[in-house]
């Protein structure tokens, strides 16, 4: 079930909104009925505000809510992990002092979570869980007793409680036979075994501190059912994304390991926000060298340089203009210059909160403050170049004179992922969220830019892609995903198919890119047809 993750989140929100006063475990029939009801509500919410007339603002509202309900994750795992580490590791001293664990320890714990749950599940369709259980045992065995198979170690071992008795004692969340000789696996639909399957047993004090800082108890999520416009809505209940674990008695549970995986940035940021002074000074303000804004600008520059080695990039390039009779000295985030082109790059680190997405106005305001504002600033820089006889930017390396005979490309890079909205440029312009003159700016998220960097092999190829993107944005075409365009550009000659004044609907293609990245990240569980 491709929507199982969202439905599980919905169930967790309901479950944590009230005390756990039930005395009896639910039967299989009750669980299946609950799942079907939640699935029906899920479908209802998807179509609840679908536009019934051709109104661009209604369409955009629906798309924002659709993304909020359905879309999970903004980038490929290797890119997400890379950016997370680079953004938060400089703050590890703060986490150590505030929570007594490091960012590295938090990250490693999250990375191990999925295996700790999956390793308890097996079926006729897959032995993935069993292989992960073997890996878990091997890791524990070597850490506890040294190399497996060492004769001296084996001679001194106490096997009175069974071959795996010591492991079972140290890992009480793993089901086993009474003699300690065999592991017992759970079927995917073994609802009665949920207490064991989703139990996360801390291996040390660090893990206990992590779990304590990120756990909710039954009843803590009462706001989910409080009287409001979004009472019990699938778009309510963001607390489970900030605190993804459940504490019941002295046990901790993780009912879907994907929640911490999908919300790495949110969780780390919310932890930091518990110390408002540090958060504002060191993470929010761009005067701090380890702030989010400073990092993202630096990351965009390094990503661009990684696949455009012959382009010189200048951060924080200044230029002088006069607007409405007032002299100004605006700053361009990144100026790129090569023998072939000039790149005008603006970077925005805005993020949409869950509240922004649900209430819509916040999402649209932040879209304008990030995407539209970045496009506006790009246009201002290009206007300066075109309006000057000898346009020059001030940089740390000195003045950089721009050759006006070279083509100029405007690029706006955002941290937030807006790909599906940006594929509806006509609607964005009609709804006044974008201006007509912004169409020829390539707007891309940092994570999509990292994919482009992995696949584009030369500046000439990149310029061809930018030329294609300019046509798509200006010829009233529509698309769903930037990576669909990239894949069709690389594999299907899309650049030769797009034409000015000939709109296209461009769908599909990104699965080819998915497959390339999936080679490094084996996707664990696919039980085929869903069991009822």
Annotate each PLM feature.
Residues 300, 330-334, 345:
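Extended, hydrophobic alpha-helical segments in both membrane/secreted and soluble proteins
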């Amino acid at each position: 079930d491709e929507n199982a993750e969202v439905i599980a989140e919905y169930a967790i929100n309901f479950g944590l909104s009230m005390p756990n006063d039930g005395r009896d475990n639910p039967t299989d029939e009750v669980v299946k009925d609950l799942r079907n009801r939640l699935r029906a509500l899920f479908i209802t919410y998807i179509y609840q505000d679908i536009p019934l007339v051709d109104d661009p603002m209604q369409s955009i509202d629906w798309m924002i809510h659709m993304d909020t309900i359905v879309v999970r994750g903004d980038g490929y795992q290797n890119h997400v992990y890379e950016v997370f580490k680079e953004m938060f590791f400089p703050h590890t001293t703060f986490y150590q002092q505030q929570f007594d664990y490091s960012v590295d320890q938090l990250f490693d714990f999250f990375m191990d979570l999925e295996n700790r749950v999956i390793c308890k599940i097996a079926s006729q369709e897959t032995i993935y869980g069993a292989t992960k259980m073997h890996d878990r045992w091997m890791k524990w065995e070597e850490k506890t007793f040294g190399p497996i198979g060492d004769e001296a170690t084996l001679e001194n071992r106490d096997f009175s409680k069974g071959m795996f008795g010591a492991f079972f004692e140290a890992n009480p969340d793993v089901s086993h036979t009474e003699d300690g000789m065999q592991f017992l696996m759970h079927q995917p639909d073994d609802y009665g075994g949920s207490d064991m399957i989703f139990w996360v047993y801390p291996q040390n004090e660090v893990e206990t501190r992590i779990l304590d800082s990120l756990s909710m108890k039954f009843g803590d999520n009462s706001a989910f059912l409080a009287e409001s416009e979004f009472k019990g809505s699938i778009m309510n209940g963001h607390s489970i994304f900030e605190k993804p674990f459940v504490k019941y008695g002295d046990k901790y549970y993780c009912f879907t390991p994907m929640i911490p995986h999908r919300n790495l940035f949110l969780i780390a940021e919310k932890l930091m926000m518990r110390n408002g002074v540090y958060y504002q000074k060191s993470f929010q303000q761009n005067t701090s060298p380890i702030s989010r804004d400073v990092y993202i600008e630096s990351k965009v520059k390094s990503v661009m340089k990684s696949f455009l080695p012959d382009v010189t990039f200048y951060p924080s390039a200044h230029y002088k203009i006069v607007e409405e009779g007032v002299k100004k000295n605006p700053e361009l985030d990144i100026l790129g210059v090569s023998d072939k082109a000039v790149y005008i790059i603006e970077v925005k680190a805005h993020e949409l909160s869950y509240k922004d997405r649900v209430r819509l106005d916040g999402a649209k305001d932040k879209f304008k403050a990030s995407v539209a504002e970045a496009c506006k600033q790009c246009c201002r820089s290009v206007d300066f170049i075109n309006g000057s006889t000898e346009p020059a930017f001030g940089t740390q390396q000195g003045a950089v004179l721009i050759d006006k005979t070279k083509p100029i490309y405007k690029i706006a890079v955002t941290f937030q992922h807006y790909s599906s909205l940006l594929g509806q440029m006509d609607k964005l312009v009609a709804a006044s969220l974008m201006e007509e003159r912004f169409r020829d700016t390539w707007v891309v998220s940092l994570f999509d830019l990292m994919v482009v960097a992995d696949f584009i092999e030369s500046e000439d190829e990149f310029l061809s892609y930018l030329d294609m993107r300019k046509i798509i944005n200006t010829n009233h075409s529509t698309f769903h995903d930037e990576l669909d365009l990239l894949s069709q550009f690389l594999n299907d000659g899309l650049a030769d198919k797009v034409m000015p004044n000939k709109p296209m609907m461009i769908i599909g293609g990104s699965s080819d890119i998915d497959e390339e990245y999936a080679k490094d990240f084996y996707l664990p569980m696919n039980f085929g047809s869903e069991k009822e």
